[in-house]
Amino acid sequence: MKAFRVHTGIVAPLVRPNVDTDQIIPKQFLKRIERTGFGPFLFFDWRFDEAGNPKSDFVLNQSGYKGASILVGGKNFGCGSSREHAPWAIEDFGFRVVIAPTFADIFHNNCRNSGVLAIVTSQENVDAIAARAEKNPGYQLTVDLEKGTISGADGLSIDFEVDGFTRRCFLEGLDDIGLTLRHADAIADYEKAHA
C-alpha cells in the first residue's frame, strides 16, 4: 500500500445518502480476480447511459472534476454488500480520500485495506466542502493525515481524527499483508520450532 501523509487534490461532490456498493461497482463487473482494473466501472450505471455514452449531468463526467482524487459523499456511504471491489474501484479510478458523515463499517475497513483514506466528519463540514466544489469545479483540498486537517486555499479548515491503527497503517503504507510481513522472522522461527 502506498504511504499517505499529505494529499492535495480536486474534490468531486457526490453527496447522496446511502450510496451502496452495488452503485459504486455494479455486480456485472465483479468477475476479475485482480485488485486493479475496476476504475472504469466506478458508478457505471450513474456515469453512462444504456448505450455506454457518458451522462453529462453526472459529476465525474464534468470537466471541472476530471482527475478528482477526493470524493465527498453522503451519510452511510458504502452500505450494502461487503465487497472489496467497491474501494478497489474508487482507488483505481484515482481517489485517495473519501469524506462523508458516516460510512458502512465493512466498507470503511475495506477502504483502509485498499489504501483509500475514509474520513468521517460532520454533515455540516461535508455540506461546506460540497458547496465549494459545486460552486467552483476544480476546487482543491489538502488532507494532512499527520496534522489531522483538511484545508482549502480559501481558508476552509477542518480537523479530523482517524483511529491510531488506521493512522499508522496509512503513514507507514501498511496493509494487512504488510503488517504480517513485519513479523516474518517471528513467523519463520515459530514454523521452525513447530515443524
UniProtKB/Swiss-Prot annotation:
CDD domains reported for this sequence: IPMI_Swivel
GO MF assignments: 3-isopropylmalate dehydratase activity
Pfam family, one: Aconitase_C
Pathway in which this enzyme or protein is active: Amino-acid biosynthesis; L-leucine biosynthesis; L-leucine from 3-methyl-2-oxobutanoate: step 2/4
EC identifiers of the protein: 4.2.1.33
Annotated keywords: Amino-acid biosynthesis, Branched-chain amino acid biosynthesis, Leucine biosynthesis, Lyase
Annotated Gene Ontology cellular component terms: 3-isopropylmalate dehydratase complex
InterPro entries: 3-IsopropMal_deHydase_ssu (IPR004431), Aconitase/3IPM_dehydase_swvl (IPR015928), AconitaseA/IPMdHydase_ssu_swvl (IPR000573), IPMI_Swivel (IPR033940), LeuD (IPR050075)
BP-aspect Gene Ontology terms: L-leucine biosynthetic process
Quaternary structure, from the entry: Heterodimer of LeuC and LeuD.
HAMAP family for this protein: LeuD_type1 (MF_01031)
Family, as annotated: Belongs to the LeuD family. LeuD type 1 subfamily.
Protein name: 3-isopropylmalate dehydratase small subunit
